[in-house]
Swiss-Prot record:
GO terms for biological process: L-tryptophan biosynthetic process. Belongs to the TrpC family. It comes from Roseiflexus castenholzii (strain DSM 13941 / HLO8). The gene is trpC. Keywords: Amino-acid biosynthesis, Aromatic amino acid biosynthesis, Decarboxylase, Lyase, Tryptophan biosynthesis. The keyword Amino-acid biosynthesis applies. This is Indole-3-glycerol phosphate synthase. Its EC number is 4.1.1.48. The keyword DNA-binding does not apply. It holds the Pfam family IGPS. GO terms for molecular function: indole-3-glycerol-phosphate synthase activity; phosphoribosylanthranilate isomerase activity. The lineage of its organism: Bacteria, Bacillati, Chloroflexota, Chloroflexia, Chloroflexales. InterPro entries: Aldolase_TIM (IPR013785), Indole-3-glycerol_P_synth (IPR045186), Indole-3-glycerol_P_synth_dom (IPR013798), Indole-3-GlycerolPSynthase_CS (IPR001468), RibuloseP-bd_barrel (IPR011060). It catalyses: 1-(2-carboxyphenylamino)-1-deoxy-D-ribulose 5-phosphate + H(+) = (1S,2R)-1-C-(indol-3-yl)glycerol 3-phosphate + CO2 + H2O. Pathway: Amino-acid biosynthesis; L-tryptophan biosynthesis; L-tryptophan from chorismate: step 4/5.
Length: 269
């Protein structure tokens, strides 16, 4: 089936091979292992009450095109960090989302020199290869996104384990009950429910309600709701379903007052 996800993944395989030729795995692994230690993504989410906001550095999307014309990733990160976000998601896909790994590198440097409150950084991309996990750590990421729909069980488990070996955590993204089952089976401790279907790109918050009810009550993983969240009412709704954090991009970067929107969605108003 020719879907947007399949097109993205086909290009991603080519992109990863190009990067591997440019910087071999062993060289990237050395960079990853000598990078400053990662910050604790999960602890940052748990520390924010009543709900944690993962604020996204996002310039564009395949469905909406460019969202913010005067895109300044460092300024966005500084605004997010200064107004109560718990963590920052950084889109690094170049072709479809106009992101870049250098944004993580720049934001990490901003935090390390004390120019803004230091928050954990999530590399948000279509991760399909161990090289990308190592690359994420080398550039300063503290966590990575793993999309269950894009991975078989063996690869999902391997990428999750590699992230852990490098001191990172993973936001394991699901969209239906079968994907949730698979995520739990490999030991995912942070589950992200994407309210947007990555095949059709339609969005409904009901996806979060449905999957939240399927989480185990004992040793329950952190639950993050992603996509389709634009207002404080949306945040309150998903929180009532047991959500621990929300990941928001479009609503922030398109807001007339970004700082105010961060405070609104993070429950800081």
């Amino acid at each position: 089936m020719d879907t947007m996800l399949n097109r993205i993944l086909a290009h991603k395989r080519i992109e990863v091979e190009r990067q591997r030729i440019k910087t071999p795995y062993d060289q990237m692994r050395t960079r990853a292992e000598t990078a400053p230690p990662p910050r604790d993504f999960g602890a940052a989410l748990r520390a924010h009450h009543p709900i944690a906001l993962i604020a996204e550095v996002k310039k564009a999307s395949p469905s909406k095109g460019v969202l913010i014309e005067n895109f300044d990733p460092l300024a966005l990160a500084r605004t997010y960090a200064s107004n109560g976000a718990a963590a920052i998601s950084v889109l690094t896909d170049v072709r479809f989302f106009q992101g870049h790994l250098k944004y993580i590198e720049g934001i990490r440097a901003l935090f390390d020199r004390g120019a803004a409150p230091p928050l954990p950084l999530l590399r948000k991309d279509f991760m399909i290869d161990p090289y990308q996990i190592v690359e994420a750590r080398a550039y300063g990421a503290d966590a990575v996104l793993l999309i269950v729909a894009a991975l078989d069980d063996e690869t999902l488990a391997a990428l999750l384990a590699l992230a852990g070996d490098l001191g990172m955590q993973a936001l394991v993204e699901v969209h239906n009950a079968d994907e949730l089952r698979r995520a739990l089976a490999v030991g995912a401790r942070i589950i992200g429910v994407n309210n947007r279907d990555l095949h059709s790109f339609t969005t409904t918050l009901e996806t979060t309600r449905h999957l939240a009810a399927l989480l185990p009550s004992e040793n329950r993983p952190l639950l993050v709701s992603e996509s389709g969240i634009f207002t404080a009412d949306h945040v309150a709704l998903v929180r009532s379903w047991g959500v621990d954090a929300v990941l928001v991009g479009e609503a922030l970067v398109t807001a007339p007052d970004i700082a105010g929107k961060v405070r609104e969605l993070g429950g800081r108003l």
